[in-house]
């Protein structure tokens, strides 16, 4: 059976500080680096061999991908980076402490912004220091494509073309695939893979560790789903 392994990036410095991160390019914490290394070791123990890998354009996912491949002795595997695998854009919440945001806007409102499938958080100002509109890595994109805020619905809409153009064809071709990405971009793809409805995906959480494995038949029907080491 062909395998797809999702690894959410290890703990980031902003995860550690309980801040909304989104598209902010935050590095891994010491714990997160170790989680990525341990992910690679679990992959090696499981004997999973990859043909190609995909990740976002954010360093926490890129470093997780590189470390996981290195410690599974597969650092040579081709890696393609795409903004379509980025974390959900948290808009004006980016950089805010989650507890302080709850105090400012109310627990219920922040919960809706975080967990609702189709409610958008406040937009990020285009002159914000974390705005993608002035970030060189997105210079090739039309400005109308660059988000100022996203919910899970929008995250899936921008990740889905990459799934259909790159990931799914590789799986159909019998290739084992590694994806180093983010909690919400992985959740969005899991919703599509498992054909979950809008309510069912709200209860799905993706931990920083360990990696999540899907096995598929030739028609991309899920035949197995499990976390490595569990």
From Swiss-Prot:
<keyword id="KW-0312">Gluconeogenesis</keyword>
<feature type="binding site">
    <location>
        <begin position="8"/>
        <end position="15"/>
    </location>
    <ligand>
        <name>substrate</name>
    </ligand>
</feature>
<feature type="active site" description="Proton donor/acceptor">
    <location>
        <position position="87"/>
    </location>
</feature>
<feature type="binding site">
    <location>
        <begin position="21"/>
        <end position="22"/>
    </location>
    <ligand>
        <name>substrate</name>
    </ligand>
</feature>
<dbReference type="GO" id="GO:0006096">
    <property type="term" value="P:glycolytic process"/>
</dbReference>
<comment type="pathway">
    <text>Carbohydrate degradation; glycolysis; pyruvate from D-glyceraldehyde 3-phosphate: step 3/5.</text>
</comment>
<keyword id="KW-0413">Isomerase</keyword>
<feature type="binding site">
    <location>
        <begin position="183"/>
        <end position="184"/>
    </location>
    <ligand>
        <name>substrate</name>
    </ligand>
</feature>
<feature type="site" description="Transition state stabilizer">
    <location>
        <position position="182"/>
    </location>
</feature>
<dbReference type="GO" id="GO:0006094">
    <property type="term" value="P:gluconeogenesis"/>
</dbReference>
<dbReference type="Pfam" id="PF00300">
    <property type="entry name" value="His_Phos_1"/>
</dbReference>
<keyword id="KW-0324">Glycolysis</keyword>
<feature type="binding site">
    <location>
        <begin position="87"/>
        <end position="90"/>
    </location>
    <ligand>
        <name>substrate</name>
    </ligand>
</feature>
<feature type="binding site">
    <location>
        <position position="98"/>
    </location>
    <ligand>
        <name>substrate</name>
    </ligand>
</feature>
<dbReference type="InterPro" id="IPR029033">
    <property type="entry name" value="His_PPase_superfam"/>
</dbReference>
<dbReference type="GO" id="GO:0004619">
    <property type="term" value="F:phosphoglycerate mutase activity"/>
</dbReference>
<dbReference type="InterPro" id="IPR005952">
    <property type="entry name" value="Phosphogly_mut1"/>
</dbReference>
<feature type="active site" description="Tele-phosphohistidine intermediate">
    <location>
        <position position="9"/>
    </location>
</feature>
<feature type="binding site">
    <location>
        <position position="60"/>
    </location>
    <ligand>
        <name>substrate</name>
    </ligand>
</feature>
<comment type="similarity">
    <text>Belongs to the phosphoglycerate mutase family. BPG-dependent PGAM subfamily.</text>
</comment>
<feature type="binding site">
    <location>
        <begin position="114"/>
        <end position="115"/>
    </location>
    <ligand>
        <name>substrate</name>
    </ligand>
</feature>
<comment type="function">
    <text>Catalyzes the interconversion of 2-phosphoglycerate and 3-phosphoglycerate.</text>
</comment>
<protein>
    <recommendedName>
        <fullName>2,3-bisphosphoglycerate-dependent phosphoglycerate mutase</fullName>
        <ecNumber>5.4.2.11</ecNumber>
    </recommendedName>
</protein>
<dbReference type="InterPro" id="IPR013078">
    <property type="entry name" value="His_Pase_superF_clade-1"/>
</dbReference>
